[in-house]
Each structure stands twice: as C-alpha cells, then as structure tokens.
Amino acid sequence: MIEYRIEEAVAKYREFYEFKPVRESAGIEDVRSAIEHTNLKPFATPDDIKKLCLEARENRFHGVCVNPCYVKLAREELEGTDVKVVTVVGFPLGANETRTKAHEAIFAVESGADEIDMVINVGMLKAKEWEYVYEDIRSVVESVKGKVVKVIIETCYLDTEEKIAACVISKLAGAHFVKTSTGFGTGGATAEDVHLMKWIVGDEMGVKASGGIRTFEDAVKMIMYGADRIGTSSGVKIVQGGEERYGG
C-alpha cells in the first residue's frame, strides 16, 4: 500500500504540480505565532535556555525548541504561559534504532515536552525501505499519543521523489507535521521545498520550515509558500525586523 500511495503522489505531482504562493501575504502576528524559538547548539548552557524562554514569553512565540536535556528546565521557565516546549528525537542524524527513538520521545514527554521533532532515517528512505521508515515514524507517534509529532525529512539530502515519499509516509504513519531540516545538514529550508511538502500533505498536516531563516522577509516567504511553523534561532531579530518595517 505504501509504495502504491507514493507512486500515486509522484504521478499527480508530474501532472498537476504548480509552484505558486498558497496565500497572498503574512503579517507580524502571523510570523510571531508561527515561530519556534530554537537553540539546539551542542554548547548551549542552562543560562542560554533561560534566555531563550524569556524571549519566547516576551515575544509571544508559539514555542521553544531545545535539546532533550533542557526540556525540564524549559518547562519550568515557561510555567503558566501558552508557549510550547518542543524537543528533538533521533537528532540530528536520524540513524538511531526505532525503539531508541520511541523511548527518547517517551522520556521527553515525561520531562514536559509538548511536541516532538523526530528525524527520519534518511538512509532507509533513500534505499526505498518504505516499511522501515513507516514503522520508525509510527513507533514515535504511538509512543506519545496526544502529542504533536513532526518528522524532519532533511530535504537537502533528498531528490524530489524522495521528498514526496517522505511526506506520504509521514502522513500515513500519523505524524502531524513534516519539517524541512535539522539545521545540521548541508542546506536549510527553501520556499520550493516548503511548497512541495504542503502540496503533498495538504491541510491535514502542517509544515515546519527550519534552517537558514534569519529575517522577517525569509519568514514571510516561507509562510506564503505553505509553512505553518518557523524553526529559527533568530526569532527576536525576525520580529524586530517586521516591527521596524511595519510598526509594532
């Protein structure tokens, strides 16, 4: 069934796909509410995470995205706010065993995570091991039922048909979002990739653009081409850029 669904999606892409914006514009509040303020640096300190959380509260961002060891701290810093705590699983390579990813997700939720960004097994995807990729994603989704799971497909390593396959499998496996990049690969988000991903998953799933988004204009472009969330370490700079251009 998985292979058939992929082939069907590829055929539709070849016949009907057209690259064009999915919305006419995006304002400051659209950008603000889409941002997942991110610090996944290997040298991030507790003070760095506290600062990240403070900035997210002050700017009313959707969430913060932190490494697993800082989930509990972020939860404490954001207590009493609507800011979500997002963390990563199988990060950044996606090459962990499936059961390891599932346990990582469980521990993250127990520590206070609201959302999980898991990395797909890129090698298995490129080898067309569709069932493996499906079960890898499904195991994480099932292990944290009720929590949002985003699948990082690492677009910089994939050709168009592989991007389509990754999106189709993520949808079949019950994930809630597909995400462009870890930020540790050879490239980040592009409007072309974001639009393709949204075209494949439709309105039933979200798309998170991440990697190289540093300005207000970058964020607006991603949203106009289909991004529902923006993963960036430049959240404050992005919003300030919008305020300078259009007023607070």
UniProtKB/Swiss-Prot annotation:
Reaction it catalyzes: 2-deoxy-D-ribose 5-phosphate = D-glyceraldehyde 3-phosphate + acetaldehyde
Homology family: Belongs to the DeoC/FbaB aldolase family. DeoC type 1 subfamily.
Species of origin: Thermotoga sp. (strain RQ2)
Main location: cytoplasm
UniProt-listed Enzyme Commission number(s): 4.1.2.4
One GO MF term: deoxyribose-phosphate aldolase activity
Entries under HAMAP family matching the protein: DeoC_type1
Origin organism lineage: Bacteria, Thermotogati, Thermotogota, Thermotogae, Thermotogales
Name the UniProt record assigns to this protein: Deoxyribose-phosphate aldolase
